[in-house]
Amino acid sequence: MKKIIFAFVAIVCFGLSTAMAQNVNTDPAITQFVEQYFPKATIQMVMPDEDDIDVVLNDYTKLEFRLNNEWKKVDCEHSTVYSSVPTELIPEQITAHVNANFPGAIIKKLEKKFRGWEIELNNGLELKFNSNFRVTEIDD
C-alpha cells in the first residue's frame, strides 16, 4: 500500500512540476539567445529555481542561465541537431588550445564559472581553465 501511495505522489509531483515548468514565460533575453545561437531549435521547457534558469530545447540541447539571464552553461551532448557548442560562444583561447592539443575533438559542453571555464570534449575529456585560459585540470 505504501508503494502505491508513493508512486501516486511521485506521479502527481512530476506532473505538477512539468506543468509549472512549461507555463513559465521565457525572458526575451533567453529567447533571443536561443534564436541567435540555436536557430534550428525551439524552447521546449523552462525551469527556474532559486539559483538559475534551466532551459531545454526541442533538440535536447540544455542551457543554463544565471538569474540575470546571462548564459552560464551550454550542453549539446544529446542534441539531435547541433553536434557541438556554437563556436561564437567559445573563447578563442579555448578553441586554440583544443585544436592544438586535441585535433578533431569537438566541444560538447561549455560552462562559464566565476573563476574560469569548463569544457567537455566528445572524447569524454573534461578540461578546466582559469580566468587567464590556462588549463588547471584535465579529467577523463
Annotate each language-model stretch with its function.
Residues M1-V24, V34:
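Bacterial Sec-dependent N-terminal signal peptides
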